[in-house]
């Protein structure tokens, strides 16, 4: 969990001054819907996010591929068949977490798909809501820009600690969809698309809707409650100290 927070913080430090650290379609779309980001940049940004996620997954696969076959052999996993989500989860998210909750009928009964949808919707809602809060000029408690990535990382750690068993905490359609496509190409087949329960769409759609709803909560409920910044007092010309020649 700490790793996720650190990864997010580092990524924001690297990309904030270049692209605003838009690594997540849920954030990009929510910002555009609520007039915080130009629509003309949405599609290029999302394509970049997908390509970046695919490239990152491919890089990690090249580095760690030697561990995949022994793990699958030891656990009697046949890639592409049911049960191979236990190895495919390094790429894609599943409902529920195959390693933490399981892949049995009981596990699926404990975590129905609607619960996984709620997990992603609510988790992303809080993520995007906190982003709005952390960048709000009227928020006197917002962190200095230097510490914004750290604050965001802490938010991610908190969300992961709650939602990881339920939906593996996607929060980001690009983070799931890009690596999921790679998993499909590498032989996970139907365990990638459509997924063992047909749930491939949830880690993308639920976060987008959750992000948009976060914008609604922020702009319609939270923002009006902030105290308005008072105007700077106007100093009359005659009250200004004169300068001697």
What are these regions (language model features)?
Residues 1-245:
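Membrane-interface helix-loop junctions and terminal tails of multi-pass membrane proteins
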């Amino acid at each position: 969990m700490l790793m996720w927070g650190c990864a997010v913080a580092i990524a924001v430090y690297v990309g904030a001054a270049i692209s605003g650290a838009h690594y997540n379609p849920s954030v990009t779309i929510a910002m555009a819907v609520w007039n915080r980001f130009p629509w003309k940049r949405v599609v290029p940004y999302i394509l970049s996010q997908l390509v970046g996620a695919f490239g990152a997954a491919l890089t990690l696969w090249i580095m760690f591929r030697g561990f995949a076959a022994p793990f699958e052999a030891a656990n009697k996993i046949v890639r592409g068949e049911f049960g191979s989500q236990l190895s495919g989860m390094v790429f894609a998210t599943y409902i529920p977490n195959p390693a933490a909750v399981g892949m049995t009928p009981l596990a699926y009964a404990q975590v129905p798909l609607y619960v996984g949808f709620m997990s992603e919707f609510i988790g992303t809602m809080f993520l995007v809501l906190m982003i709005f809060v952390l960048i709000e000029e009227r928020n006197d408690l917002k962190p200095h820009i230097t510490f914004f990535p750290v604050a965001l990382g802490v938010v991610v750690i908190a969300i992961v600690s709650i939602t990881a068993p339920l939906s593996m905490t996607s929060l980001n359609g690009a983070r799931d969809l890009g690596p999921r496509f790679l998993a499909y190409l590498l032989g996970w087949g139907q365990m990638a698309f459509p997924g063992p329960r047909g749930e491939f769409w949830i880690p993308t759609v639920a976060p987008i809707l959750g992000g948009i709803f976060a914008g609604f909560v922020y702009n319609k409920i939270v923002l009006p409650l902030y105290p308005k910044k008072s105007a700077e007092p106007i100093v009359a010309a005659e009250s200004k100290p004169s300068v001697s020649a």
